[in-house]
Swiss-Prot record:
Membrane-topology descriptor: Multi-pass membrane protein
Keywords, in A-Z order: Cell inner membrane, Cell membrane, Membrane, Transmembrane, Transmembrane helix
Family classification: Belongs to the UPF0299 family.
Organism in which the protein naturally occurs: Shigella boydii serotype 18 (strain CDC 3083-94 / BS512)
Annotated Pfam families: LrgA
Record keyword DNA damage present: no
Transmembrane segments: 7-27, 31-51, 63-83, 93-113
Cellular compartments annotated: Cell inner membrane
Protein's UniProt name: UPF0299 membrane protein YohJ
Coiled coil regions, renumbered to chain: none
The organism's place on the tree of life at top rank: Bacteria
InterPro entries in the cross-refs: LrgA/CidA (IPR005538), Uncharacterised_UPF0299 (IPR022957)
Amino acid sequence: MSKTLNIIWQYLRAFVLIYACLYAGIFIASLLPVTIPGSIIGMLILFVLLALQILPAKWVNPGCYVLIRYMALLFVPIGVGVMQYFDLLRAQFGPVVVSCAVCTLVVFLVVSWSSQLVHGERKVVGQKGSEE
C-alpha cells in the first residue's frame, strides 16, 4: 500500500508542478502588453526552474513521461480543428507549401551558420595537414 501511495504522490506532485508553471505563465501573459501564449511562458518558467536546478528533474519526470507517451493523442483535436478549414487550405495550398519550404530553408541556414559560429571549423581526423 505504501508503494502505491508513493507512486500516486510522485504523479500528483509532477502534474501539480507542471500545471503550476502553466498557470504562472498564463498569469504573466495576462499582465504583458504583448500577446505571448501563456503556455509558452509556462514552459520557459519550467525550463528555467529545471536548468537552474531549483526544481529537481525527478519531481516532474513521471508527469512528463506520461505526457510524452500520449503526445500523439493530444494532437488529434488540433488536427480536427485544422480540417474545419480544409477548403481554405486547399485554396491557399501553393502559398502554404512555398512558405513552409522557405521557412525550412531559412531555419537550415540559420542553424548551420550559428553552429559554424559556435563550433568553428574543425579538422577531420586523418585529413592532410591535420598532423601538427
